[in-house]
Structure formats: structure tokens, C-alpha cells
Amino acid sequence: MSLLHQARFFITVNHLRDLPATAVPEVAFAGRSNAGKSTAINILCNQKRLAFSSRTPGRTQHINYFSVAPVKAPDPLAFLVDLPGYGYAEVSGSAKYHWQGLLSDYVQTRQQLAGLILMMDARRPFTDLDCQMVEWFLPTGRPIHVLLTKADKLTNSENAKALRETRKMLQGYAEQLETPVPMTAQLFSSLKRRGIEEAQAVIAGWLNLPEARKAEREPAAANSVPPAVPPASDPAA
């Protein structure tokens, strides 16, 4: 079982000064208000109401932290960070300004941030605001993994095209950097439970969770060559 299943609500933050003063790694989830971010977090953590999604898109304008640790552990091993959804037109100007500042400052300056899970609707990936989020985060030199959500809404050929074009866009961004940074993408569907294990593996690896370390050891053990068995001695010799 993934340790992500043990995630628990930790704190809500509305200003950078209130971010937890911890040294453990964090993985942030970002995306448009209607990209299915909260639903995906719940599915990845095998919980129904860990991350709440407002009935009115754009209402969530703060940062929610979820701790990841075994049930009886005294301290978190890591955090999942649910960032405010962006791009909803009915948010007031002052709220939108605060919201955008909180998002950009967090993703650009948070030293504990190990990677960004960027959620995009598979039917319309890389909107202008999605590109803005990538451009904010790119200079940090940390990895980005795109979840193309709502893949169940598309045909197989449409999904293949969306994934191919998304990877091409990410490659273009990666080529802007002097030092290569992992920028990956996958299809994801909360409804069809598609892509869950793949996404969990990425997150666990970034957070250095025990399950990721175990997965690294298992292929090495499977591919190791057993020691040669010496030939039996001939009793008649």
C-alpha cells in the first residue's frame, strides 16, 4: 500500500509567512480551477474527502498542506501541497492579485519543493495560464510531471495526440535550460482510475518515500546475476 494513503490534513496557509517551518520535501499540485485537481489528489491518496473541491470554481484561494507519514509517526515524512486553482474569471481583481502572488512566490521560492504536479485538462492542455505556471517554476531546476486529466472524455487516438503534443511542449521548455530537468507527462482519469500507480510512483520518488526506495531495490535484485555454483568434486578422483 502506498504511504500516500496515510495522508492527513495538516494546515491551511494564506500567506507565505505562515508556511510550515519544516525541512521535509514537498510536492505541489497546481492546475486550472476546473482541471480536477482536488479529485485527483483524493484518488491518489485513496480517500474521498481529503482535498475539498468547492462547488464554485475559483473559491479556494489558499494553500492546503497534507502530511504524509505512517499513522503513529511523530512527525511528517513529507507534504502534499494543494495550491489554489487558477483561471476562473469570476474571482474579484484584488483576490486574483493576492492569489497569483501567492502561487508565483510559493513555486519560485519554496526550498522544500521537490517537484510540481501540473494538472491540465486533456481536451485543452497548455492554456496561457498553464504556460505561465511552467515559466514560473522552470528556473528552479526542479521536475514537472503533467497529469492530463479527464482522459476518459477522449478517444484513444485523441489521448495519444494530446500526450504527444504535451511531451513536445515540455521538451521545448526543457531545452531552454542549461542543465536538463525531468519534465514528463501521462494520461490520467479519476473516473476510470487510469494512471494512478504511475503518478503515485513519480510522487513517491520525489518525496523519497520508503516505497520508492523499495521499488529501486527490487529491479536491481531481479537483474542481479546469481553467483556461479562450483562444479561438484568427483569422489572417484
UniProtKB/Swiss-Prot annotation:
One of its GO terms (molecular function) is metal ion binding. Mg(2+) binds at S38, T60. GTP binds at residues 31-38, 58-62, 82-85, 149-152, 187-190. One of its GO terms (biological process) is division septum assembly. Residues 227-237 have a biased composition (Pro residues). Residues 214-237 are annotated as: Disordered. It comes from the Bacteria. InterPro entries: G_ENGB_dom (IPR030393), GTP-bd (IPR006073), GTP-bd_ribosome_bio_YsxC (IPR019987), P-loop_NTPase (IPR027417). Pfam families: MMR_HSR1. GO terms for cellular component: cytosol. Keywords: Cell cycle, Cell division, GTP-binding, Magnesium, Metal-binding, Nucleotide-binding, Septation. Belongs to the TRAFAC class TrmE-Era-EngA-EngB-Septin-like GTPase superfamily. EngB GTPase family. Necessary for normal cell division and for the maintenance of normal septation. This is Probable GTP-binding protein EngB.
